[in-house]
Curated annotation (Swiss-Prot):
One of its GO terms (biological process) is protein urmylation. Its main location: cytoplasm. Acts as a sulfur carrier required for 2-thiolation of mcm(5)S(2)U at tRNA wobble positions of cytosolic tRNA(Lys), tRNA(Glu) and tRNA(Gln). Serves as sulfur donor in tRNA 2-thiolation reaction by being thiocarboxylated (-COSH) at its C-terminus by the MOCS3 homolog UBA4. The sulfur is then transferred to tRNA to form 2-thiolation of mcm(5)S(2)U. Prior mcm(5) tRNA modification by the elongator complex is required for 2-thiolation. Also acts as a ubiquitin-like protein (UBL) that is covalently conjugated via an isopeptide bond to lysine residues of target proteins such as AHP1. PANTHER family: RURM1 PROTEIN. Pathway: tRNA modification; 5-methoxycarbonylmethyl-2-thiouridine-tRNA biosynthesis. This is Ubiquitin-related modifier 1. It holds the Pfam family Urm1. The modification 1-thioglycine is found at residue 97. The lineage of its organism: Eukaryota, Fungi, Dikarya, Ascomycota, Taphrinomycotina. Transmembrane segments: none annotated.
Length: 97
């Protein structure tokens, strides 16, 4: 079972400049959205930048998570069960200036 992940707002820079990924749910070990977040943190190109994506076991404040265009806050957050064909978008609202 595959899902699509998009990385917007500069998050692609943490993932070798990949703006979109296709991932197999079997690679995550669980169908929970929290497992996807853990997996994404593990594949960050530079481990020293992990804290730019994850904080205390979840995405850091300032990163919006959408599942099939719905805010994850409405979908049980980390407990949401991913399904075949789901599209998960991570959007960073944190910008320098």
């Amino acid at each position: 079972m595959a899902i699509k992940v998009e990385l917007l707002g500069g998050l692609d820079l943490l993932f070798n400049k990949q703006k979109a990924l296709s991932l197999s749910l079997s690679n995550l070990g669980s169908t929970k959205l929290g497992s996807l977040i853990d997996y994404m943190a593990q594949i960050i190109e530079k481990p020293s930048q992990k804290d730019l994506f994850i904080l205390n076991g979840t995405v850091r404040p300032g990163i919006i998570v959408l599942v099939n265009d719905q805010d994850w806050e409405l979908l049980e957050k980390e407990e949401y069960n991913l399904e075949e064909g789901d599209e998960v978008v991570f959007v960073s609202t944190l910008h320098g200036g």
